[in-house]
Amino acid sequence: MTDNHGRVINYLRLAVTDRCNLRCFYCMPEEGIDWLSRKELMTFEEMLRICSIAVKMGIEKIRITGGEPFVRKGIMSFLTDISKLNGLKQITITTNGVLTAPLIPELKKLGIQSVNLSLDTLDRNRFFAITHRDEFPAVMDTMHQLLQHDIDVKLNAVVMDGKNIQDIIPLVNLTKGLPVSVRFIEEMPFNGGDSHYQVLTWDHIKILEAIKEHFPTIEKIQDPAFSTSYNYHIPGHKGSIGIIAAYTRSFCGTCNRVRITPQGVLKTCLYDGGVLNIKDLVREGKSDDMISAALINAINHRAKDGWEAEQTSTHESMAAIGG
């Protein structure tokens, strides 16, 4: 598939739930959350059909996200089903790691080669302050077990002024002894109504400057095709570093991805308000061809970049959008 700006679309991010067992303040409020009802959520059968249609249209990679995907019952059976889709080249998962460790051998058998692990700090007390849950040991256990099973690990850390700036260098230090990719992400205004977010102070330039102060030999390395991050390596380190300009939005020109929320809404940009409810089409009995045509029409009316897309959006929580 190609959009109206000539960008190839071959990557789908599918959020299977809006629920999460952590309460990271930048993602969702700690209390007063309006969870989606079971009726509003797509069933796994509906998701499988949508994924099958998408793969036939040219989607080669599917990332499973949430909320936290592993809190939804039946997720492993669903992963088994989509792993059998002919033409799908890669399945990846974004998880907070709390429930993941016992499932890693099965994930390996399913052919999962890469997992993104959300980890904003290496300090247990700060972890609790950010997530409101004391689950730091479980997340670290997941990281080490993923590496033991030869599954690529990307650590995603949201950089927040006054919250975890002191963790930037310790997280970079992880790459010295471990073959992990540590990715620092600009904070985005998707906390579902919490007013803590004011203005971005730590952009991708400032993050890199902070790292360079401690690691002056850091080198820029080639970014993979369609990469959302600026990628770096420190000589002598086993891992790498990425900086994602999520708020600055400097990667829109090569964006190859679309999102589907837990309630089946297609988002052709993280920042748009949703452009098509695919779940409704499925429940209305539309054929695969009709759904494909609706998807193509939506992709052919895609915003040029996140700034244009944001003009029509409302700031939902990241859990509801699909992290």
Q: Where do the model's predicted regions map?
A:
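Canonical Radical SAM [4Fe-4S] cluster-binding loop centered on the CxxxCxxC motif
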Residues: 4-42, 270
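Radical SAM/AdoMet-radical enzyme domain recognition
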Residues: 41-64, 68-185
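Glycine-centered loop/turn positions within well-structured domains
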Residues: 22, 124-125, 250, 276
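A short acidic, helix-capping loop that chelates divalent metal ions and anchors anionic groups
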Residues: 32-37, 123-130, 191-195, 277-278
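Accessory C-terminal segments flanking Radical SAM cores
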Residues: 191-307
